[in-house]
A protein has these predicted regions:
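Short, acidic, Ser/Thr-enriched surface-loop or helix-capping motifs
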Residues: 28
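Acidic, low-complexity cytosolic segments
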Residues: 1-23, 33-149
Length: 149
């Protein structure tokens, strides 16, 4: 594991510890996983890969809709609530936030979690990620994905 990837995973882990989020990951806008929090087992990694692909598809469709309204705007964030409100323990939310043009932060958490806290901590994590990447822009992890800035 590269040093940068390890630092990214630490940021994702801290997001979970600070918020009660069940999963946090960095993904590309093509649906590829860059980094996932370290508390994942093999089954969770497969679920995250599927969520990453689905999130990329949702993002792409939403961006097309935004382009129809105003072609000069870029989608910044999507929040998806899932569940029937019959069993709040199983209802969940997916929050997808753009970090760079091709890198997204995907967070999955119980619907009953404080969304304001999630937004606050996610924004802190995004700032940390951007600072890390600026410090180590030559790292292969991001160079393979393309230009970030």
């Amino acid at each position: 594991m590269s040093e940068l990837r390890g630092k990214l995973i630490k940021i994702l882990d801290d997001l979970i510890v600070n918020t009660g989020v069940t999963s946090s990951s960095l993904i590309t806008d093509d649906g590829l996983v860059i980094a996932i929090n370290s508390q994942q087992n093999e089954e969770d990694e497969e679920v995250n890969a599927n969520f990453a692909a689905i999130s990329a598809s949702i993002l792409s469709m939403a961006e097309r809709g935004i382009e129809i309204v105003n072609e000069n705007k870029m989608l910044e964030q999507i929040k998806i609530d899932a569940g029937l409100n019959q069993n709040l323990d199983e209802d969940f939310t997916i929050l997808i936030t753009r970090i760079y043009s091709n890198v997204l932060l995907q967070v999955i958490f119980p619907k009953k979690t404080n969304v304001g806290l999630i937004h606050f901590e996610a924004n802190k994590a995004i700032k940390l990620i951007k600072n890390l990447v600026k410090q180590d822009i030559s790292e292969d992890l991001f160079n393979e994905i393309g230009s970030l800035l």
